[in-house]
Amino acid sequence: MVQVNENYLKLKAGYLFPEIAKRVKIYSQSNKSAEIIKLGIGDVTEPLPRACIDAMSKALDDMGTAEGFRGYGPEQGYSWLREKISEHDFISRGCQILPEEIFVSDGSKCDSSNILDILGKDNSIAVTDPVYPVYVDSNVMTGRTGDALENGTYQGLTYLAINEGNNFLPELPQKKVDILYLCFPNNPTGATITKEELKKWVDYALQNKSLILFDAAYEAFIQDNDIPHSIYEIEGAKDCAIEFRSFSKNAGFTGVRCAFTVIPKNLKGLSSTNEEIDLWPLWNRRQSTKFNGVSYVVQRGAEAVYSLEGKKEVRGLIDFYMENAKIMKNKLQTAGYKVYGGDNAPYIWIKVPDQMTSWNFFDFLLQNVSVVGTPGSGFGLSGEGYFRLSAFNSRSNVLDAMERIINI
């Protein structure tokens, strides 16, 4: 009989969001008339920008002609999209990222997991706590951790707590760590990082020859001018950081699937014989072998994000969701809740009432007012006592949910 990858057996009971879905399903089956409002998973709700729809429609028409038909595209992404990304997302901010350093993909969730394919298994790893679960679970699945402990952490990982005490900004590791996962604006806490604080991490990575895996999936939601949108705004970052970006949240592409990862050509790693190895060719080979590229139609839709009309419509989507976040934060604070995030990110991070755990509060809201959020403990040990609400929903649902919660 075939042997299984036993690393999967080390995973905790279930990925956070399937566990939420299971509880909601049980509740809905017993309360068939309940009008459930889901503010849990960070999925968008508003229609795609018209500029993107028109571009994809035209691309489909192109595919229906002999002249315009496209088969397999470049695994790295079409040059015209990579050039737009380079110009608008990086060069415009003073970041000298070349088009060929950009790899178009079908999701930053995939890329942040798949990047491990080109990194050795003996690297030491640090994650924030709480943390986006994919960072931890993907390392468990690939055998880079020890066993799960009773408190939900894993042997072999360094956890960097983020909480009220440190303004949700992790302290630098006390020892040398090879791989550092950072996400700003942060999921799940909604916290942001200044250029001065981010420079400390870049300096640490350069000094220790570490690699930063920087998730900037929510950079488009930044409202304050002094907050960096890219780690490459920090001098030296091209020598120590990989950045993940996505069209999912800013342009509503969660169901369309398009993202990109930046692998600067400066980046190097070490072989077992201490030979310096460029990371760019390794990722290029990985993608060429394991990935067939994002469809032509989808990439034309992503390209339209950078058109004048596309930028305007994307800005409208971001403003809409951030207004949702503002409404949620204001109403919850008025009701006496201690609330974080929501100013430069589409997530609200709530301190749950005393004597309640995060899952207690989840069940309390579900059972009493049919509102679904995400228990903070699902993001890590330091997330216990907190609760995440997402601003990705219709205005009417957000207003309804807030009224339900504050009137319990």
From Swiss-Prot:
One Pfam family matching this protein: Aminotran_1_2
Chain residues that bind pyridoxal 5'-phosphate: 72, 108-109, 132, 187, 218, 246-248, 257, 292
MF annotations from Gene Ontology: L,L-diaminopimelate aminotransferase activity; pyridoxal phosphate binding
Biological or metabolic pathway of the protein: Amino-acid biosynthesis; L-lysine biosynthesis via DAP pathway; LL-2,6-diaminopimelate from (S)-tetrahydrodipicolinate (aminotransferase route): step 1/1
EC number: 2.6.1.83
GO biological process: lysine biosynthetic process via diaminopimelate, diaminopimelate-aminotransferase pathway
Cofactor dependence: pyridoxal 5'-phosphate
Reactions catalysed, as given in the entry: (2S,6S)-2,6-diaminopimelate + 2-oxoglutarate = (S)-2,3,4,5-tetrahydrodipicolinate + L-glutamate + H2O + H(+)
Entry-linked SUPFAM superfamilies: PLP-dependent transferases
Gene3D superfamilies: Aspartate Aminotransferase, domain 1, Type I PLP-dependent aspartate aminotransferase-like (Major domain)
Enzymatic class: transferase
Binding site for substrate: 15, 42, 109, 132, 187, 292, 388
Disulphide bridges: none
Modified residues (N6-(pyridoxal phosphate)lysine): 249
HAMAP family: DapL_aminotrans_1
Subunit structure, as described in the record: Homodimer.
Job description of the protein: Involved in the synthesis of meso-diaminopimelate (m-DAP or DL-DAP), required for both lysine and peptidoglycan biosynthesis. Catalyzes the direct conversion of tetrahydrodipicolinate to LL-diaminopimelate.
PANTHER family associated with the record: AMINOTRANSFERASE
Family (UniProt): Belongs to the class-I pyridoxal-phosphate-dependent aminotransferase family. LL-diaminopimelate aminotransferase subfamily.
Protein name: LL-diaminopimelate aminotransferase
Originating gene: dapL
